[in-house]
A protein has these predicted regions:
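Helical hinge/lid and interdomain linker segments adjacent to catalytic or ligand-binding clefts
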Residues: 27, 37-39, 44, 48-134
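A glycine-rich, often tryptophan-bearing local segment used as a flexible ligand/cofactor-contacting loop or short
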Residues: 101-177
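Active-site rim elements
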Residues: 47-49, 159-164, 233-242
Length: 283
């Protein structure tokens, strides 16, 4: 893997510079395919097979292939990610799956402004697991205005457990074909939301300490555009679950305005697509 601070890989394996993506931005209204950025990072301090961000976003890219003509771009968005605002300005949607993402989105003023511009023009926003996280409380307010929920602050709640994830009775399009399934995962719960929020739909719940907790949601933002989030996916092996792959795929597609059949989408992948990336210290 290159040591440059950012890496952009088209799913067709064509490597292109960030400037070329930015130059395409005016074509968004001229019929070009919608472009979705899949933002991951190198491994953090968690053990192998957890927080496998790049392997996760590459799998999402695989699932999104041949879905309504979307153009999917996998990005290793390690700080300082100076080209990030350019890339976001050329995108129609973004998936955030990286370390302490709520802090990461908001800590750089230009980066936050680019996410806000993406939201303002109706772009789709998806966040997965620690991508919605911040140890500090300060980033929460700006983040929830974009994504709807945040795992943030010193009072944030999380738990590793074996439990059944249960789709809500909302009839939401993201839930097409999704059934209850038992999983072992770390879930964030009691998530922070905007002070006044409407049209935020709980999608999936898990019983934690006797209470049903929302761990996935869909939100039609008041100023236009859609946001989707799922707080699971601590363990990379959970991508092997059909229900997980379907939930994430359909959440991303819904966020960018793509139709989802009532019975859900096929999410078959090769076994090799489910493997985590080798760690630098692996033998």
């Amino acid at each position: 893997m290159s040591a440059r601070p950012w890496i952009v890989i088209l799913v067709w394996t064509l490597l292109i510079p960030a400037a070329a993506l930015a130059e395409d931005q005016p074509n968004a209204a001229a019929g070009r395919p919608k472009r979705v950025l899949l933002l991951g990072q190198k491994p953090d301090s968690h053990p192998a097979n957890t927080h496998e961000y790049m392997a996760g976003v590459r799998l999402v890219a695989k699932l999104l292939q041949n879905r309504g003509g979307l153009q999917t771009v996998v990005v290793q968005a390690d700080n300082p990610w100076r080209n990030g605002p350019e890339l976001l300005d050329g995108a129609d949607g973004a998936v955030v799956f990286l370390t302490e993402g709520a802090k990461w989105v908001t800590e750089d003023a230009d980066r936050l402004a680019a996410f806000q511009r993406l939201a303002k023009r109706g772009g789709g926003l998806t966040v997965l697991h620690w991508g919605m996280g911040t140890r500090e409380a300060a980033p929460v307010a700006d983040f929830v205005r974009l994504f709807g929920c945040c795992h943030g602050g010193p009072d944030r709640k999380y738990k590793v457990l074996t439990a059944t994830i249960t789709p809500s009775s909302s009839g939401h399009p993201v839930l097409g074909g999704i059934k209850p399934v038992e999983v072992h995962d770390e879930f964030y719960y009691a998530l922070k939301q905007p002070v006044q929020v409407e049209k935020l739909v709980p999608l999936v719940r898990v019983s934690i300490d006797g209470d049903d907790q929302t761990v996935a949601w869909a939100w039609e933002r008041p100023e236009g555009g859609r946001s989707f989030g799922f707080s699971g996916l601590h363990f990379h092996d959970n991508w092997k679950l059909t229900e997980y792959r379907r939930l994430v795929l359909q959440g991303v597609l819904w966020s960018v305005g793509q139709p989802i059949p009532p019975g859900g989408l096929a999410v078959d992948v090769a076994d090799a697509d489910l493997l985590p990336a080798p760690r630098p210290d692996s033998k």
